[in-house]
Design a protein with these regions (language model features):
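S-adenosyl-L-methionine-dependent methyltransferase catalytic core, i.e., the SAM/SAH-binding region
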Residues: 1-155
Length: 155
């Protein structure tokens, strides 16, 4: 990931409860399957020693860049991947048993505030609606291309 992204504005939800529920051990292996801006990931990684590992996955390249900057120097491995591809990611990196997995599903404040993503009702911008902007068609193109019946099926 190249250019330095702007800092995240997203605040992780229920941070104390998440950490408590994961029962983190210093040498454990944990997965944040929706790592986003790295809020929960930073809390998890701060409790790991060099033998521990946090594996962070996200579809959003900009979120991964923010997370990479935020977690620099911590025992973290990041992957541009959807959490449904976790088995393949784990097979590639050949790690031991996973001690805990976190999925914080939904949109982040960063995605809502990015007018180029089209997730917000408060801003006017292109109707993209993709978490992974490197894959698939933006919504505006689908709307132009598909017949109304197909759009109704999607919605």
């Amino acid at each position: 990931m190249s250019a330095e992204p702007s800092p995240t504005i997203h605040v992780p939800v229920l941070p104390a409860e998440v950490i408590q529920a994961l029962c983190i051990t210093a040498q454990g292996i944990y997965v944040d399957g929706t790592v986003g801006g790295g809020g929960h990931a930073e809390l998890i990684a701060s409790q790991l020693d060099p033998d521990g590992l946090l594996i962070g996955l996200d579809q959003d390249l900009l979120a991964l860049a923010r997370c990479e900057s935020r977690l620099n120097g911590k025992p973290v491995m990041l992957a541009h991947s959807n959490f449904c591809e976790l088995p393949e990611v784990l097979q590639q990196i050949e790690v031991g048993p996973i001690n805990g997995i976190l999925l914080d599903l939904g949109l982040s404040s960063d995605q809502l505030e990015d007018i180029d993503r089209g997730f917000s009702f408060n801003s006017s911008g292109p109707l993209d609606l993709r978490f992974n902007t490197a894959s698939g068609e933006p919504a505006w193109r689908l709307i132009q291309r598909l017949r109304p019946e197909h759009l109704a099926d999607i919605i």
